[in-house]
Every structure is written in structure tokens, then in C-alpha cells.
């Protein structure tokens, strides 16, 4: 049976794992790394780079290197968080025809689902390379606090990447799976997950194979990227005070600042002080400017104190929703790279009253949990029951713009709930069902997931028609809504897409584009390999010619030199097919050179052999000798 992989599609880094026997194994990528940067870049000549190769060239190509794309997935362009993000990244965020936030690189517009698909493709290829077989199915993780639009957009990304997404699983739940798979005793655990772009906290009861999520809370726009930006702004402000130049106006300088800030932040987790040193960061009329600044751990902690505090409020809400106190929590599991910061660990310890558990790798545990869930779905992992919850309340807009909840937050999923409504006016023949997700009392203050019309309601006074609205949330946390007129049994059903969202046609087109790109990438790789082989052949032939010029006949030498020159010209100007043809011609001509060298070597060997035979006669020296008889020998001895 083909393997199902587990993918942690992260804001900053992504990770892929697979079940091997009874345990999950993280797979190393082609660079030998266990995590892959969630970055996609488009070069000047149209090449697409993903992961480490994209990160390496980010400083020189900031406007076409896309990162932290997960913060845009499933969001509209007008969303305040999108507008905030525009000031944090050097690439362009644009408004799509459907109102969603998309990105632009080299004049091409891409949806966040497409960019995420390129990253998922890289993870898929990493797994295929390790397993030696095609991978077509996956379990993908998302922040627990992702709404329906964000979950659907992640599932779309999987489809574009050529993966059947068997399950969307919440990141803290995945981490709990990896942490608690071998725990037999009942435990109440808190998973504190602070990643690159999102924060989640989940309270779970685990033991004897049952993982029950009691509550979840979080902030989908709070993570390591925000910590980096605090340091970037501090460095930029200090530099401006000193030099009168705002580095944030220069995209290349901003990218260098961002990389330096991230590096400094990581170093300050183990050191009390570090130095940011960026020579030639900019220039003015007086000449080049350099940025050199010492940063202490206490300075960084002061810069991000409010961000750390922002993670504590969701912890309080999660405990309240679960009906437990901090003292009742047995273990606190830290997840996400940003959770390595000592001040964060201190804040968590202070809030929960105990040391957080450091036994799991915060960068890998989520992918491992996804692989375990994949194993459960495949039947390879037995006796594991996962009971997750919906993070936000779901409901519809009713008279006066009120948000009427049908499913409360932290309800165990999958779940189904129905409620009967009626018309607001006499003889109303149609109703518009507007579906929202959130916790505010007025519908307009929550996230509009979608809307649809139920038409053909028989004329009747207001309040008489019976319209049943049913919500159905599947195990992925994705919503289906139906409305039925009980009198006529007319029913209208929609699978919620983001109010913008990608249509099936959009997704199909993106799948085709991804496949075309895969072919393009394969062709490009083959072209590079052909050129490399051609260069190697040309160099080897040239070396042979130089070393054996006196042993090759004039005609053969002229033919080889002509074929070599033709290949060199093809390498400069020719197509891949032309290079292959010239390589073949040079190979054939070189065979004649080989024959000539062989004949020359054979002739030399024969000449040496013949010379050796003559020498045995010519070089012998005739010596005078006297024959002595035996009697004479005896006399000599006695003398």
C-alpha cells in the first residue's frame, strides 16, 4: 500500500514525516536538512526556486522571493491583518479579482494556495526521493485557530500540489499525538504552539490511545515574524537616528536587515549579547554606510514583551473554556521554533506554575504527529482515537444583523446541528443564508464564510414558513451548510468556500499549471545536465588533444578540433538538441582519435619489443677466459 505522508506546512519552515514501523520518522530534504524554508522565489530567467535555494538568493532578489505566505492564506485583501502584512514584506501583495489577497512576482499574480502548493510539492518530492515510490496522499497540519476559509485554502494547496489531502489536522493536536502516543496514564496537557506566523494553545486530555481536545484558542497573526519585525524596526530606527536614512524604504536593505534580525534573535536564545554587522547597507553623498550594533538579550525581551503577553490571554481563555485551572495541567508541551526563546519559556512557567516539557523537538513534532494521524487513517497505527474541536463558533445572520450561533466553539468534530428559522416579511419567496464564523454578537463583526439563496418558498405570512438550516462540520473542520423549506422539501446546500476563495475551475487550472511547471522543471534540469555533460566531454577531448598532439595524425586532429569547436559554439548559442547532436559528432570523431592513439601505442610497444631482441646480441661484451682443469683447481687451493 502506498505511504501516506504527514506535512507540517509552516509559516517559516516546513517539515515532512512518515511512519516507519511504530514510530514517525522525519525525512531529510535534498540539502540534508530536516526542515525546509517555506520560501518560493522566481528568478529573472523564469526559474522557480523552493526552500533553501530560494532563501539563499533572497537578499539579491527581495521583491520576487515570497515568504510567510501562510499569513495570507484564506484572507481577503481588505482584511486589516493583510494591510498590516503589506508593510512587513518586500514583495507585492495585490487584490485578486475575487477580493482575496494574492502576491505578485515578475508581473505574474499567484494565490497563496498556489505558493503553498509549490512548498508542498517540494515536501512531496522529498518524501518520494526517500521512499523510492510515488506519494499521492497526505495529512497536512494547520493552526488550530484557522477558520474555515483558511482550512479550505490549505486543502486547495494540497490539491494543486497533486496530493489528496486525507485530513487537515490542527497543529497542537498533531504535537500532542507525537508527544502522547506511548502515554498510558490519563494526563491533562497544554500545547503552547508559537510558530513563525501563528500562535495556538490547546488543552487536551490524553491517555490509553484517546486524544480529546477540550478547548483551543489562539491568534493567527502572531509569531516569530512579528518578533523579527520588532528587531528590524529597532535596528532601522537606531540607524536612522545616526545617519538620517530610513532603511525600510530600500527593499534590498530591508531584506538584509530581516535576515540579520532573525539570526540575532536565534543567537540571543543561547547568548546574552550578539552583534549585528551589515557592511555597505546603504550609501549617501558622503559615501557608503555600515550598520554595526550590539544587541543584548534584555533589549530584545523589552522590545517583544507585549507580544509575549499576547500569548498569555489565549491561554487563560483556553483554560476557562476547558473548565480547568492552570494547576490541574500535568504537562505543558512547547511547539514552534519561537518557543525556544528563554523569556517565553519563563512566561509559560510563570503562568502554568510548572516547568514546560522540553522533550520534543519543537520544529519536528507537528510533522511527526501528522505522520501518526496518516498511520491511523491507513490502519497502520491501532487503538488511537482523536477527538478534535472546532475553534470558532459558527452561525448565520438573522433579523437585525444578529449573529445566531448554531455550533458553539470547542464543539467536538465531526458534528451536525440544525435549527428552524422563518421569514421576516409577508409573502417572502426567498431567503439569503449568510454564514459567519467568530465570537462577536453582531454578524458583521465576524468572518463571512459564504452565502447562498433558498428560493421558491410558497407565499405565506411572515413567521409561517419553516426553514431548517443545518451545519455539518467534517473531521477537517470544513463546513457544509444546507437550508430546507419544510413545506416543499426544497433544499439548497453549499460547501463553504471563502467569500472570495478559489473555484473548482481555478483549482483545476492551477493543478495544470503546477503539472506544466513540473514538466518545465524536468526539462530545465535535463538541459542543465546535457550542458554539464557537454562541457565535461569538451574539456576531456581538449586535454587529450593537448597531451597527445604528436601521436595523432593531421587529418584526425583537424576533424576532432572542428567537432570540438562546433560543440563549443553550440554551448554558447545552441539549443539542447543542437548540443546533443554536436556531442554525438564529437564522440564519433573522438573514436578516430582513440584509434590513432591506440595504433601509436601499439607501434611503440612493437618497436620496443623488437629493439629488446636486437640488444641481446649487440650489447654482449666478449670476455677472455681460460679453461682450468680440475687438477689445477686443487693445486691452487692447496697453495
Curated annotation (Swiss-Prot):
Q: Which gene encodes it?
A: dnaK
Bias (Basic and acidic residues) ranges: 630-639
Residue positions where Phosphothreonine is found in the record? 198
InterPro entries attached here? ATPase_NBD, Chaperone_DnaK, Heat_shock_70_CS, HSP70_C_sf, HSP70_peptide-bd_sf, Hsp_70_fam
Write out the entry's keywords from A to Z. Answer: ATP-binding, Chaperone, Nucleotide-binding, Phosphoprotein, Stress response
- Give the matching Gene3D superfamilies: 1.20.1270.10, 3.30.420.40, Actin, Chain A, domain 4, Substrate Binding Domain Of DNAk, Chain A, domain 1
* PROSITE patterns per the UniProt record, alphabetical: HSP70_1, HSP70_2, HSP70_3
Functional note:
Acts as a chaperone.
Q: Does the keyword Nucleotide-binding apply?
A: yes
Where is the sequence biased in composition, kind Low complexity?
600-615
**Which portions of the chain have biased composition (kind: Acidic residues)?**
616-629
Per the record, the similarity remark reads:
Belongs to the heat shock protein 70 family.
Listed GO molecular functions?
ATP binding; ATP-dependent protein folding chaperone; unfolded protein binding
Q: What is the name attached to this protein's record?
A: Chaperone protein DnaK
Induction summary:
By stress conditions e.g. heat shock.
**Which residue ranges does the record annotate as region Disordered?**
597-639
